[in-house]
From Swiss-Prot:
This is Hydrogenase maturation factor HypB. Residues 99-260 are annotated as: G-domain. Involved in the maturation of [NiFe] hydrogenases. Required for nickel insertion into the metal center of the hydrogenase. Exhibits a low intrinsic GTPase activity, which is essential for nickel insertion. Disulfide bonds: none annotated.
């Protein structure tokens, strides 16, 4: 996992900028350099014919790194990322900008779902997209074809967006006050779960072509998400996919996760998805209004 491997160092390119961004949150020794194994580095736990490398406090394995060393590296990386995320969140709040982080495996239909969402939302308020991929700007071009501005972040070898990248991309977007910002993360059900970008919610998109047990195989992502969009439901008649089992698996990992069945092609669930966006946006704005009123009362008490 990239909280210990430093896979993206120096690889990121934000479209329109003429230099690459090194990630200061990845400045640490690479675990794949051969060195004597520390005493703490235990062999993987075995259960019958299976090997479990995700045991121990770090819940990960890297040759030559102890569990305590891996934990320190992870805390350093995520601590720096969280500071950038807090800065992003403050900027989003100042703009009354509602931000969603869309996460999924490759091929889940994120971009098709997003373009259809944009078309249905219309121009009632400002919209923008930050696109994350290892290479190309194909998805950003699809978004721009809808008339909505998009900034492409190419992560190179990196397998996720981080808050520092998003902060740079946000600086390239204008006139978003009171609007919606969608962040389409790199297709990956592992690493994006750990990285807060400053968003209001993570939305996990799972297509019915992937298998209903994905929430159990990749629990961190579904635990981090507030909503699961079960996508490509128009294909269900052609697949052996147990919808109820999938939802049960997701709620085993995260009892509070909401689930909406959607299809960009047939339109199923799109109204419910848009209503969820409006409801969550309204809840967040009302919470900010309440906080501002409380601040105003505190100031009035000083008069």
């Amino acid at each position: 996992m990239c909280t210990v491997c430093g896979c993206a160092e120096g690889e990121t390119r934000i479209e329109g900028e003429h230099h690459h961004h090194g990630h200061d949150h990845h400045h640490h020794e690479h675990p794949f350099v051969r060195r004597p194994a520390p005493a703490e580095a235990a062999p993987p736990a075995a259960g019958g014919p299976n090997l479990h490398f995700g045991q121990g406090p770090a819940r990960a394995h890297a040759p030559g790194l102890s569990q305590s060393r891996m934990l320190r590296i992870e805390q350093d990386i995520l601590g720096k990322n969280d500071r950038y995320a807090a800065e992003n969140r403050a900027r989003f709040e100042a703009l009354s900008l509602f931000v969603l982080n869309l996460v999924s495996s490759p091929g889940s239909g994120k971009t098709s779902l997003l373009t259809r969402t944009i078309e249905l939302l219309g121009r009632r308020r400002p919209l923008a997209v930050i696109e994350g991929d290892q290479q190309t700007d194909h998805d950003a071009a699809r978004i721009r074809a809808t008339g909505v501005p998009a900034v492409q972040i190419n992560t190179g070898k990196g397998c996720h967006l981080d808050a520092h990248m998003v902060g740079h991309a946000l600086a390239r977007l204008d006139d978003l006050e009171g609007g919606l910002l969608f962040i389409e993360n790199v297709g990956n059900l592992v690493c994006p779960a750990a990285f807060d970008l400053g968003e209001a919610h993570k939305v996990a998109i799972l297509s019915v072509t992937e298998g209903e047990d994905k929430p159990l195989k990749y629990p961190d992502m579904f635990h981090a998400a507030d909503l699961m969009l079960l996508n490509k439901t128009d294909l269900l008649p052609h697949l052996d996919f147990d919808v109820e089992a999938c939802i049960a698996y997701a709620r085993r990992v995260n009892p509070d996760i909401e689930v909406i069945r959607v299809s960009a092609r047939s339109g199923e669930g799109m109204g419910e998805w848009l209503a969820w966006i409006e409801r969550q946006r309204g809840t967040r704005l009302r919470a900010r209004i309440d906080a501002l009123r409380e601040q105003a009362r505190a100031l009035e008490a000083l008069l």
